[in-house]
């Protein structure tokens, strides 16, 4: 998953102008797609309480920072942002006005009370498993409490979250995220997710189908199923049998209006036969798979507790490409894990050459407090990490540009997602996730049109519409 920083657009605003005394919320989202989804669901719960969204903290009554804890310096980024908000809160107080500040997400879960100690201006700390309690927590804040909600909830948070209004969902576009699984039981030694998101939990088929049908009814054409280990999803199917993600995808493909399906992020150990069959048989399932491996060295994979070997990963890729020859792969890589030798790194480079990725994320290892990796000796020098990362990224970039160039001359169906920057221009999404720019002023957002790729841009494709 990427670690972009986004904010929730003011999609919950009513069609009519809000009253002058309406409370406004600004939500800033750091991190992965699951945080984007979580921010939207928090916004939905606040909309039910009368809040409307704003695209700036300057006129917000409530500012929520939905945080990520995967990368190094996540906490420093948070406290820097809180420092800026403290000045804003002090200025409001001088004018007799209030600003409520909340911290949500994985840093909130990891640090809890420590956030209140370091940033006394914060009013609310709420973890990712308890944001269904957000309205109640805010009521307690208005009563004068400083609130920390980071206990893992016994109740199912999704059962307690209000469904977004149809007009609000429409404003979010024709592509949507849908969380189907949370948490992780793999305990990779470098990763904080099991400690911030908890153990693996799968949403019920009934919940997922109902939410997907609501999204489709609101005009959504493409669904991306989300989970920390999304292909670990399982549950009782409508036929009474135990379903895996493959069976779930077959069920969602039957929903009228849903034209494209995707899922992320996957673990190699959970790619089962039914899921591979879905890639073979479902035309709605896009030929793009994010399948992190982290290293090409068996020795490092063992130290990371990945519980598979490099050749097992390569054989899995071969199986998938045998049933879906046009499959494009993306991945995640960590360089400089404790004990990584030159040969270990060269093994990673060779695996990258063998797979030939369409796109991948790569990072220097940074120890995360509380993880087993943080206690390992034989740390790699920063200069060595830097040199290895540069080499790996150069190879991955070359593969990415080669993949984009291979699209030139190809014909494909593209889902139109939004107007482009130029008049009459539209931006769509290729089956392989790349943005596609088309000079077209007749079709509408949500239409699927047939195009030919004529050139490439920076991380995008340029296309002509075909009759």
Swiss-Prot record:
Q: Where is the Radical SAM core domain?
A: 170-402
Chemical reaction(s) catalysed: N(6)-dimethylallyladenosine(37) in tRNA + (sulfur carrier)-SH + AH2 + 2 S-adenosyl-L-methionine = 2-methylsulfanyl-N(6)-dimethylallyladenosine(37) in tRNA + (sulfur carrier)-H + 5'-deoxyadenosine + L-methionine + A + S-adenosyl-L-homocysteine + 2 H(+)
Instruction: Cite the EC number.
Output: 2.8.4.3
Q: Which cofactor does it need?
A: [4Fe-4S] cluster
Occurrences of domain MTTase N-terminal (ranges): 23-143
Q: Which residue intervals make up region (Disordered)?
A: 1-20
Q: Which residues does the record give as [4Fe-4S] cluster 1 binding sites? A: 32, 68, 106
Could you tell me which Pfam families the record lists for this protein? Radical_SAM, TRAM, UPF0004
Q: Which residues form the TRAM domain?
A: 405-467
Question: Domain of life, per the record?
Answer: Bacteria
Q: Name one GO molecular function term.
A: 4 iron, 4 sulfur cluster binding
**Entry binding sites for [4Fe-4S] cluster 2:** 184, 188, 191
Record HAMAP family: tRNA_metthiotr_MiaB (MF_01864)
Q: How does it assemble?
A: Monomer.
Q: Which family does it belong to?
A: Belongs to the methylthiotransferase family. MiaB subfamily.
> What is the protein name stated in its UniProt record?
tRNA-2-methylthio-N(6)-dimethylallyladenosine synthase
The species this protein was found in: Brucella melitensis biotype 1 (strain ATCC 23456 / CCUG 17765 / NCTC 10094 / 16M)
Task: Supply the gene name.
Answer: miaB
